Every structure is written in C-alpha cells, then in structure tokens.
Regions:
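Alpha-helical transmembrane segments
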Residues: 21, 270-286
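N-terminal membrane-entry
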Residues: 258-268
Length: 292
C-alpha cells in the first residue's frame, strides 16, 4: 500500500471519528453543563450554611428593602413622580456567586440563578432580570428569571413549554424555599413587557425564554404565583445537595433517551457516509493492486 493510499485511509478514519464526535457532542456537553450546575448549587448551599444568623438576616432585610423600593418606585411612576433610587441589591447582598437556584420537577430542571442576563450568565444558568424584584418573594413583588432554550451544549429552559397551569417550581434563596404555582402561560413579542411589572398585593415570579424553538422571534412567559411550600412535595424528601446530584444524573439519562432518535439518525448518516468512503478507497486500492 503506497503512501498516498495510507493518507487517504487515515483521512477517512479521522472523518469517521469526527462524525462520532459530532453525533455525541450534545449529550456530552449537556452532561458537563449539568455537572457545573450541580457544583454551583452545592457551593451556594455550603455558603449559606456557613453564614451566621446575623449576616443571613441582614442579607434578607437588604433584599426586602430593595424590593420595597421597587414597589415605591412603581407608586411614584403611577403618580407621575418617577425617581431613580440608584440602589442595586448587588451592593447590599453577598451570598456568593449565585443568588440561589431554581428547581422545576416536571421538566427536571435544577439550575443556579445569577445576577443579570448577559450571554455569559445565560450559558451557565438562569439570569435574574435587572429591575425586577429580588427573588425572595413578598407582597407586591415580581421577580423575572430568564433562560436560554435550544442550546446544543445545555438544556436549560428548553422544555419550559411543557409547563401548564397548576405546575409548580421552586426558588431556593438563602435558607428559604419559595414555591410558585403556574397561573399563566403567554407568548408575546420581545417588546411587550406589561406582564413583567409588579402587581400591587401579588407575589409573582415569571420564567422567560425564547420561542418558537430555534426561531426565537417571540418570548414565552410562564408566570407563577406564590403558594405555601410543603417540604415534601418538591423531591419527596428534604432537599439536599446529594439529591440534586441524583436528579442531574437522571436528567442526563432522560435526555439521552429522548434525544437518541435524532442522535442515532445523525450519527448513522455521518458515520455511514464516511464508512462508504472508506470502502470505496479500499476497493480502489485492491483494484489497483490487481492491475499491478
């Protein structure tokens, strides 16, 4: 076998390996993303558990004052007396890198919540929309949490459209767990933000993602209203870090099963085509040897 033939065969083998890599990328990258999310959740829990009561209470009070200022600003806006308080919870509350984390049992979501909605934030978790209430709940508050949908490397809010009225999601903020029950699902244009404002007397949290899937011309708003939290209903036991890690493992397995038809079709086409190329090269080599 001459050098040229060896190079062609080597190239064909490399292409086959590349095809396998392309086909397996979504699953592997999602496993890595899930692992990072699990680590962030564990770090947050450890940070909160290490905080003394005085510091924790001070952080909660700062968050509530911030939310009250947002409510007061809403009243001034309604009266035509808008004023910028210049206050940011970032300057007042320090509980680590993330603000907390969200769990959505129905769609196996367990993600850290970060300040802001930059691309860097939304690639690793859920972002808290600036100008919305700090996600600690309370009367006349409305926190808005945003997440990407349809990324190849992470699931994030991809399955948010499966939530229906009556489903629940949970916010783990400091040492509290806030339960929200979905009471409204809407699709709006990006500039339509009326459904994200504070409603006097209500305690809302709205989850936002792009829709339709992979087109992203509109926004899906899944709003939850605060309901009493029963410590058993979220995971069937007291929430612990080890349980979240188990949930992450279950999520990855579920994703592999759900995505397997697409993975197998894509992988089969790529690998099959490259295997055919390899066979053609081998046939050509054999024919050349016979001719010689």
């Amino acid at each position: 076998m001459d050098t040229s033939t060896r190079l062609k065969l080597g190239f064909a083998a490399l292409m086959i390996l590349s095809g396998i890599g392309v086909a397996s990328y979504p699953v592997i990258s999602n496993m890595v993303a899930q692992r990072h999310a699990s680590t962030a959740i564990q770090n947050y829990d450890e940070t909160v558990q290490s905080m003394d009561t005085e510091k924790l209470d001070a952080a909660k009070e700062a968050a509530r004052r911030y939310n009250q200022q947002l409510g007061n600003a809403l009243d001034r806006d309604a009266a035509g007396e808008a004023e910028d308080t210049g206050t940011s919870y970032v300057d007042l509350i320090d509980v680590g890198e993330s603000l907390g984390y969200i769990t959505i049992p129905k769609i196996d979501v367990n993600l850290p919540i970060y300040e802001g909605t930059s691309d860097d934030v939304l690639l690793k978790g859920v972002g808290h929309l600036e100008g919305s209430s700090y996600p600690l709940g309370g009367e006349s508050t409305h926190s808005v949490l945003t997440g990407h949908r349809g990324l190849a490397e992470a699931v994030l809010f991809t399955d948010l459209d499966k939530l229906q009225e009556g489903d629940k999601f949970y916010l783990h903020i400091m040492d509290e767990v806030l339960a929200y029950q979905v009471d409204q699902v809407k699709v709006v244009l990006p500039e339509e933000t009326d459904d994200l404002t504070i409603v006097q007397g209500q305690d809302y949290c709205t989850l936002v993602t792009c829709t339709p899937y992979a087109i992203n011309t509109h926004r899906m708003l899944v709003r939850g209203t605060r309901v009493p939290y029963n410590g058993e209903e979220e995971t069937g036991d007291t929430p612990q870090v080890v349980q979240y890690q188990a949930l992450h493992t279950g999520t990855v397995i579920k994703r592999i099963v759900d995505a397997w038809p697409w993975i197998s079709v894509t992988g089969s086409v790529i690998i099959g085509g490259e295997a055919l190329l390899l066979l053609l090269l081998l046939h050509r080599c054999k024919k050349r040897e016979e001719d010689d």
